[in-house]
Every structure is written in C-alpha cells, then in structure tokens.
UniProtKB/Swiss-Prot annotation:
<keyword id="KW-0677">Repeat</keyword>
<dbReference type="GO" id="GO:0009295">
    <property type="term" value="C:nucleoid"/>
</dbReference>
<protein>
    <recommendedName>
        <fullName>Transcriptional regulator MraZ</fullName>
    </recommendedName>
</protein>
<keyword id="KW-0805">Transcription regulation</keyword>
<dbReference type="GO" id="GO:0000976">
    <property type="term" value="F:transcription cis-regulatory region binding"/>
</dbReference>
<dbReference type="InterPro" id="IPR035644">
    <property type="entry name" value="MraZ_C"/>
</dbReference>
<keyword id="KW-0804">Transcription</keyword>
<dbReference type="InterPro" id="IPR007159">
    <property type="entry name" value="SpoVT-AbrB_dom"/>
</dbReference>
<dbReference type="InterPro" id="IPR038619">
    <property type="entry name" value="MraZ_sf"/>
</dbReference>
<dbReference type="InterPro" id="IPR037914">
    <property type="entry name" value="SpoVT-AbrB_sf"/>
</dbReference>
<dbReference type="GO" id="GO:0003700">
    <property type="term" value="F:DNA-binding transcription factor activity"/>
</dbReference>
<comment type="subunit">
    <text>Forms oligomers.</text>
</comment>
<dbReference type="GO" id="GO:2000143">
    <property type="term" value="P:negative regulation of DNA-templated transcription initiation"/>
</dbReference>
<dbReference type="GO" id="GO:0005737">
    <property type="term" value="C:cytoplasm"/>
</dbReference>
<comment type="similarity">
    <text>Belongs to the MraZ family.</text>
</comment>
<feature type="domain" description="SpoVT-AbrB 1">
    <location>
        <begin position="5"/>
        <end position="52"/>
    </location>
</feature>
<keyword id="KW-0238">DNA-binding</keyword>
Length: 152
C-alpha cells in the first residue's frame, strides 16, 4: 500500500526517482514494472504497479464500446497508458505526452493512493489539496452515503 505525499524532482530526461521507502516492495512484489496513464478528472498522472494496472484494465475491458461515456474512459485511460520500468537507480521515465498532460516541470509531487501513485505538478497539487481540505470541512461531505460509515 502506498501512502504519503513526497516532493521529488523530474530530471531533464523526464525521469523521476521513486522514494527509497517504496523501492524494495516495488521490486519484490511487482518487479519494478509500472503503467502510467492520465487521470480523466484531474490534471495529474496515475502510476500503477503493472499487476494493479491489469486489474484496472479488466474493468476497462468490461465497459461497453457502444456507450459514448464508457468508450471515452476506455480511450483516454488505455490510450495514454504507457509501460515504465524502474531502473537500477530507482527511476522511471515518463513520456513527453504524459508529462505534457500533467504540465510536469522540475518539482512534482508523488502521492500514494493505496494501490497506485498520483503524480502532480507541484502548484496544481497545492491548489487541489487546499480545495480538498476546504470541502472536507464543509457540509458537502455530510451528504455522502459512503462516508457516513467511515470511522477513522
């Protein structure tokens, strides 16, 4: 499980270094293989260990090709999906297309989201987390049925 937000740099070749606290698990459990794609609702990337992506892929496969909304999700998530391998220095290369989508520059945020990571442009992350915290303390959260039974 991946958790926490880490500020990391992206080098001139478009590589990011996975934090050392995750590397052993990622190599042992997932052989350092990933799939990176775009988030369809946010200006960030989603980085899945390959095995976790294969689960998502099966869900995408189950969607209807004849329903326009479902087809859009398939097209975007599968169309941008790019395999990445972690090198011996713990780095992965993000394609120019993916970097452009998320407007990634030098400083980025790698955010653990249980079975995957989100990759954000630093300023976009700060903006998003501020919005999330504001909504989290509002009445809007009280109306979500799934959250009513969540005990933290």
């Amino acid at each position: 499980m991946f958790r926490g937000a880490t500020s990391i740099s992206i080098d001139s070749k478009g590589r990011i270094a996975i934090p050392t606290r995750y590397r052993a698990e990622l190599l042992e459990s997932y052989h350092g293989s990933f799939v990176c794609t775009v988030d369809i609702r946010q200006p960030c990337l989603l980085l899945y260990p390959l095995h976790e992506w294969e689960i998502v892929e099966q869900k995408l496969l189950a969607l209807s090709n004849f329903d326009p909304a479902q087809r859009r999700i398939q097209r975007v998530m599968q169309g941008f999906a790019t395999e990445c391998e972690m090198d011996s220095a713990g780095r992965i290369l993000l394609s120019p297309t993916l970097r452009q989508h998320a407007q990634l520059e030098q400083q980025i945020m790698l955010v653990g989201q249980l079975n995957k990571f989100e990759i954000w442009q630093d300023q976009q992350w700060q903006k998003q987390i501020s919005e999330d915290l504001a909504i989290g303390s509002s009445e809007e959260m009280l109306h979500c049925e799934a959250l009513k039974n969540l005990s933290l």
